[in-house]
Each structure stands twice: as structure tokens, then as C-alpha cells.
Amino acid sequence: MHHVVSATTNPAKIQAILQAFNEIFGEGSCHIESVSVESGVPEQPFGSEETRAGARNRVANARLVQPSADFWVAIEAGIDDGSTFSWVVIESADRRGEARSATLPLPEVILEQVRAGEALGPVMSQYTGIDQIGRKEGAIGVFTGGKLTRSSVYHQAVVLALSPFHNAIYR
């Protein structure tokens, strides 16, 4: 059984990680341990590079907390060019996989508050009245009318980032 450390305690992110690992390696093939670690970037990262750096930093910090795992996974959400997205970084002892998620364009009324220094999650909670929306369906669920959720979009990116770990062409 694979020991997977998720560098997050966010249920939406953990669900995406668990689902992707089960699909790639088989149902029940992994045990996920969640740890809370720092990203080393602002609470609301801006731009692709800052967001990816946050995910890479979380993986590095998770490795320090739990060095005996088989995989370390981080999902860092950010804002880039008026849209929300995330970077997924997965590492094993000898390999790294990274993938950027799909992007969701955000309404200007939301972006104004985020640009003023507020994080997207709290802004969306104020807008919707849903407490801790970032730990649930997120802005993605709200603006797609539930057709997609934060977790479903993250899931796709985790599957993509896992490609180097199970596809022989990468070796």
C-alpha cells in the first residue's frame, strides 16, 4: 500500500488526491496522511510561477515532516490573468510530476476584492454565504452551477501529474 502525504488538510484537495490515486493505482492502494505545512508564498498567490512555487514548497515541507512516505502531493490554488487555477506537484523518492489545472475566469466584482488583498476563499464565502467555501465546492462549483467542483478540477490535474509515475514512456 502506498503511503501518500498530502500537504494540505483541505477536504476538497484530499478527496481529489485520493480519487486520482485510486484510479491510477487501484482502489484501496494508498493510505493518505494529511499534514499542514507552509507554502512560503502569500495566502493568495498571483501568477503561475508564484503558485507553482507554493506547491513545490509545500511538497518540500511535507517531505521534512514525513520523510518515509512513498509520495508527497501538494495542490496550490492561485490567480492568474483574471482566472483561478491550481498547480499540482507530486514527488516520490526519484521522480516529480507537475500539472496545471483548468482555469476559471472570475467576475470582475470578485477580482476587485482579491486584487485589494483578500483571498479568493473568504471573498467567495462573503459572496455566497457558504462558510469555508474553499474547503467545499469553491468558486468553481458556484460559477459552473455545480457542473464542476473545486475537487473535480483538482482531480484531473492530479491524474495528469501522476503520469510520470505509472507510464513507462516517462522512464
UniProtKB/Swiss-Prot annotation:
Its EC number is 3.6.1.73. Keywords: Hydrolase, Magnesium, Manganese, Metal-binding, Nucleotide metabolism, Nucleotide-binding. One of its GO terms (biological process) is nucleotide metabolic process. Its cofactor is Mg(2+); Mn(2+). Binds 1 divalent metal cation per subunit; can use either Mg(2+) or Mn(2+). One of its GO terms (molecular function) is ITPase activity. Mg(2+) binds at E38. Substrate binds at T8, T9, N10, P11, A12, K13. PANTHER family: NON-CANONICAL PURINE NTP PHOSPHATASE_PRRC1 DOMAIN-CONTAINING PROTEIN, PTHR34699. Belongs to the YjjX NTPase family. Phosphatase that hydrolyzes non-canonical purine nucleotides such as XTP and ITP to their respective diphosphate derivatives. Probably excludes non-canonical purines from DNA/RNA precursor pool, thus preventing their incorporation into DNA/RNA and avoiding chromosomal lesions. NCBIfam families: inosine/xanthosine triphosphatase, PRK05074.1. Homodimer. This is Inosine/xanthosine triphosphatase. It comes from Klebsiella pneumoniae (strain 342). The lineage of its organism: Bacteria, Pseudomonadati, Pseudomonadota, Gammaproteobacteria, Enterobacterales.
